[in-house]
From Swiss-Prot:
It comes from Human immunodeficiency virus type 1 group M subtype J (isolate SE9173). A motif (BC-box-like motif) lies at residues 144-153. InterPro entries: Vif. Residues 40-44 are annotated as: Interaction with host APOBEC3G. The gene is vif. This is Virion infectivity factor. The lineage of its organism: Viruses, Riboviria, Pararnavirae, Artverviricota, Revtraviricetes.
Length: 192
């Protein structure tokens, strides 16, 4: 019988970022209770030796599974030390991998309500509109006209600690292009 390979997208992430993600998930599961329905599985609960942890996030009938890995092949950069994250959407027997932006939007859509329909009526009547979005990571694209109008009225309050964002977990801080200065800002080009 021949070998069968299954390819998965694993985002390479540094160890400290994975530790921050895990501690934020545990904080919001146990202390703030905003993620009390989430399930955290430790490495010893898994039979796979490379799995560091799993976070199961229920989304109605489906669920999002964020799996962190350790002991992977090291990458070409110094900070690629064999740590990684995969994000999977599961519903019954169907599974597909999703990117971090979509994962954050799915979490936001299911768990966090930015503004209720009555907030528009209150804003038009000049009354105080109090709902705020606790999960800003779910807003990676331009929102609806309703959302944009209400965010102009209300500045979102920053939460400490922030809710765990999948996109922040896999963000590549090291390979971002360098910002270059133009001729007015550059000290070496104008001789000063």
């Amino acid at each position: 019988m021949e070998n069968r390979w299954q390819v998965m997208i694993v985002w390479q992430v540094d160890r400290m970022r994975i530790n921050t993600w895990k501690s934020l998930v545990k904080y919001h599961m146990n202390v703030s209770k905003k993620a009390r329905q989430w399930l955290y599985r430790h490495h010893y609960d898994s039979r796979h030796p490379k799995i560091s942890s799993e976070v199961h996030i229920p989304l109605g009938e489906a669920r999002l599974v964020v799996t962190t890995y350790w002991g992977l092949q090291t990458g070409e950069r110094d900070w690629h030390l064999g740590q990684g994250v995969s994000i999977e959407w599961r519903r019954k027997r169907y599974r597909t991998q999703v990117d971090p932006g979509l994962a954050d939007q799915l979490i936001h859509m299911h768990y966090f309500d930015c503004f209720s329909d009555s907030a528009i009526r209150k804003a038009i009547l000049g009354q105080i509109v109090s709902p705020r979005c606790d999960y800003q990571a779910g807003h990676n694209k331009v929102g609806s006209l309703q959302y944009l109008a209400l965010t102009a009225l209300i500045k979102p309050k920053r939460r400490k600690p922030p809710l765990p964002s999948v996109q922040k977990l896999v963000e590549d801080r090291w390979n971002k292009p360098q910002k270059t200065r133009d001729h007015r800002e550059s000290h070496t080009m104008n001789g000063h």
